[in-house]
């Protein structure tokens, strides 16, 4: 059954149109330089995500936002997301990498969905978030997280 779900998710990623991929890549290009702002928005929206990182547990988000450790970590997360976006529609290796690092730590589907919601909220405040952009990002996250969830 998991194979069928995974096959459907890969097919969904492949079904992203060139226009959708272009919209996702262009809007991401406008925000990828603000990795600290993106991670801050994610941690602010769901403190359980911040608590999943030992170096940030129990620390005041506003106090750590300007630190080098936070900036480095934000760069890693946003860089990973950038790799997914750059390689669209080929998400397989990124799915495997994310599952390999997050499944052992017990990251939940809810936390992934909360990351998605926080990232989308951040995007809405920083790009021209049209209906077409919304559909493109929705299809991208549906395909990527669908494949991730099938393996977790």
Curated annotation (Swiss-Prot):
Can you say what this protein is called?
A: Globin CTT-E/E'
Annotated signal peptide: 1-15
- Family assignment from sequence similarity: Belongs to the globin family.
Residue span(s) of domain Globin: 16-152
Coiled-coil annotated spans? none
Residues binding heme b are: 73, 102
Task: Name the PROSITE patterns on file.
Answer: GLOBIN (PS01033)
Q: Which GO terms describe its cellular component?
A: extracellular region; hemoglobin complex
Q: Which SUPFAM superfamilies match?
A: Globin-like (SSF46458)
Q: Which gene encodes it?
A: CTT-E
